[in-house]
Design a protein with these regions (language model features):
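Multi-pass alpha-helical membrane architecture of UbiA-family
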Residues: 1-185
Length: 185
């Protein structure tokens, strides 16, 4: 576990000093670093739970969309700073198409997770995610202003917060089963 965290901290340093300016790697690594502490749990307890992997995949795509919207909003600043972000290299229209693809994947995951796993009341968060991501995809199609990017970023940040809070509504029986499975030697 110590080696994992040494690698994690080193990767954060590399990201902040070198990688964040690179095409594609900066965006992917930013989202991955936010989700990778979940991998520490798998490493420590030596058990991989498909439900948690599903949550991590959902969060990764959500954060990747957040990074892309931030890059769209900061396009002029990133150009003057010499960054090679996805919107700079591929252009605004292709980045918006990639975002619509990410929102489509998030919509599919929002449908799949409650159907595959018993989430209890947390399933309502994922059911509500479907119209939310459809709304964002349509808004992305219609609006191209800096203000719309700011609005989307705020909505996505609120959605991440709501997702985190919705964990409280996960089926407690299921949580106890996971706890027993993970914490038994």
């Amino acid at each position: 576990a110590a080696l994992y965290f040494v690698g994690y901290i080193t990767t954060i340093w590399l990201y902040s000093h070198r990688i964040r300016t690179l095409f594609l790697w900066g965006s992917l690594l930013s989202a991955f670093l936010a989700v990778s502490p979940i991998a520490a749990l798998f490493l420590y307890y030596r058990h991989v739970e498909p439900l948690i992997l599903g949550f991590a995949g959902f969060l990764f795509l959500l954060l990747l969309a957040l990074v892309q919207i931030k890059d769209l909003h900061n396009l002029r600043g990133d150009i003057s700073a010499g960054f090679k972000t996805i919107p700079i290299v591929l252009g605004e229209s292709k980045t918006r198409m990639i975002l619509r693809l990410i929102f489509s994947c998030l919509s599919l995951i929002s449908i799949a997770l409650p159907l595959v796993f018993d989430l209890g009341l947390m399933a309502y968060y994922f059911w509500a995610s479907l119209p939310f991501f459809v709304f964002l995809a349509i808004d992305l199609w219609i609006n191209r202003s800096s203000l719309s990017y700011i609005k989307m970023r705020m909505l996505l940040k609120i959605w991440v917060l709501l997702g985190t809070l919705s964990i409280l509504f996960l089926d407690f029986e299921r949580l106890n089963q996971l706890k027993a499975l993970i914490f038994t030697p």
